[in-house]
Curated annotation (Swiss-Prot):
GO biological process: cytoplasmic translation
One GO location term (cellular component): cytosolic large ribosomal subunit
Predominant place of localization: cytoplasm
A Pfam family per the record: Ribosomal_L2_C
Similarity section: Belongs to the universal ribosomal protein uL2 family.
Annotated keywords: Cytoplasm, Ribonucleoprotein, Ribosomal protein, RNA-binding, rRNA-binding
Classification via Gene3D superfamilies: 2.30.30.30, Nucleic acid-binding proteins, Ribosomal protein L2, domain 3
Protein name: Large ribosomal subunit protein uL2
Subcellular location per the Swiss-Prot or TrEMBL entry: Cytoplasm
Superkingdom of the organism of origin: Eukaryota
Taxonomic path: Eukaryota, Fungi, Fungi incertae sedis, Microsporidia, Unikaryonidae
Sample GO molecular function, one term: rRNA binding
């Protein structure tokens, strides 16, 4: 075990607060109702802008779609027309169209494709079983009920990853907003007295990185902790 460096000792005095995100969802309104986008705001630790939509009874916050603007009229309901920002049932959306904030269960307010630049594609509708196949951002195809609702369009803020950080202070505040630690020094870049991966003529671990759970301390970057196996699985697996 390596010794605790000065920077690590200082960091242990501070408590990193967990990030608290506002739950984004839209209400259950069966009949077609008109709302208005009263504001588009930024939330800390969230890449996508948040649109505040005002309806007759209550306001809701949803991920802003590309092309949404302040003062835009939004229609919500089971039979709402297909337009950017409208909230309707997924069975009304044509095949091949991009949607976001897709519900996994009717009434949950949105589960899939809610981060910046993400969207789900409607693959096909199965009318005999009242189900719809969608392709989520990970590339996996899922089957949801055709009664689930969604927002038409692509979530805004897709170009946030194309913007370079340019300097370390920007990366520092980005990590701070998300409750992360920056910078994190690799173990192979340290000296042998500071980390078990340190030392050597060049940066190479040079020893097994799989360690027991008893040999590590909290929040220590040590390698593969208590791993049963490492590497790719070779050969067929017998059941």
């Amino acid at each position: 075990m390596g010794k605790i460096t000065r920077r690590t000792r200082e960091a242990k005095k501070k408590q990193r607060q967990p990030i608290v995100k506002v739950c984004l969802s839209y209400p259950i309104i069966p009949q077609v109702e008109e709302g208005e986008v009263i504001d588009i705001v930024h939330e800390r630790s969230r890449g996508a802008p948040v649109a505040i939509i005002s309806f007759k009874e209550d306001d809701c916050m949803v991920p802003a779609s590309e092309g949404m603007y302040t003062g835009q009229k939004i229609l919500i309901g089971d039979d709402a027309p297909i337009d950017i920002g409208n909230i309707t049932k997924i069975k009304n959306v044509p095949e091949g169209m991009a949607v976001n904030s897709v519900e996994s269960v009717y009434g949950d307010g949105g589960t899939f494709a809610m981060v910046n630049g993400s969207y789900s594609l409607v693959v096909n509708h199965r009318k005999e079983t009242n189900e719809t196949v969608i392709k989520i951002p990970s590339g996996k195809k899922l089957t949801v009920s055709s009664e689930c609702r969604c927002i038409v369009g692509v979530v805004a803020g897709g170009g946030i990853h194309d913007k370079p950080l340019l300097k370390a202070s920007v990366a520092h505040y980005k990590a701070k907003a998300r409750g992360h630690v920056f910078p994190r020094v690799r173990g192979v870049a340290m000296n042998p007295v500071e980390h078990i991966h340190g030392g050597g003529n060049h940066q190479h671990v040079g020893k097994p990185t799989t360690v027991s759970k008893k040999d590590i301390s909290q929040e220590q970057k040590i390698g593969l902790v208590g791993a049963r196996r490492t590497g790719y699985r070779v050969g067929s697996r017998k059941l």
